[in-house]
Amino acid sequence: MSRVGKLPVKIPEKVKVSVDGNVVKVEGPKGKMHFPTNPLVSVQVDKGEVKVARQDESHVAKGLHGLTRTLVKNALEGVVKGYEKGLEINGVGFKAEVKGKDIHFTLGFSHPVVFKLPDGVTAEVDAKQTKLTIRSVDKHLLGLTAAKVRALRPPEPYKGKGIKYADETIRRKEGKTGAA
């Protein structure tokens, strides 16, 4: 049996969980979300707990068992606490500005770059306009959005200019040594 999948997930206070066929719906103080589950795995809600069980002992079902339990746990944690990811912008003149559901970047191109935030994701920029914080209740959507923002101008290895995750370290390279 899956060591992760066999553990029940406790439902926190002020959170509603419902299972409608193969769709799990979670509502909490920070928001609501839903996600589909595979037919090889069943999800039941009883006595303040969510339990995940698999239909058979196939290799795929065993893998989906632990995955589904972790997705349920992440959804419950997301609607209670929420998730956030920090990004840093390095480079002369590089900055970001949030305008409604858009983030306007100045990244050294001949034009400003406009990034549209998906529904359920919010962004905030510090006073220096170099630190960007992205928040969401959906951990998966947050990671995808942060990766897309980073891909606008990934950090380069010589000077480190670009957009990087706050906890990321860039392996720096030494430049060419000029022969005189």
Swiss-Prot record:
Keywords annotated in UniProt: Ribonucleoprotein, Ribosomal protein, RNA-binding, rRNA-binding
Entry GO CC: cytosolic large ribosomal subunit
Gene Ontology molecular function: any one: structural constituent of ribosome
Coiled coil: none
Signal peptide, first to last residue: none
GO BP annotations, alphabetical order: cytoplasmic translation
Family in the record: Belongs to the universal ribosomal protein uL6 family.
Subunit structure: Part of the 50S ribosomal subunit.
Role played: This protein binds to the 23S rRNA, and is important in its secondary structure. It is located near the subunit interface in the base of the L7/L12 stalk, and near the tRNA binding site of the peptidyltransferase center.
Protein name: Large ribosomal subunit protein uL6
Native source species: Anaeromyxobacter sp. (strain K)
Gene: rplF
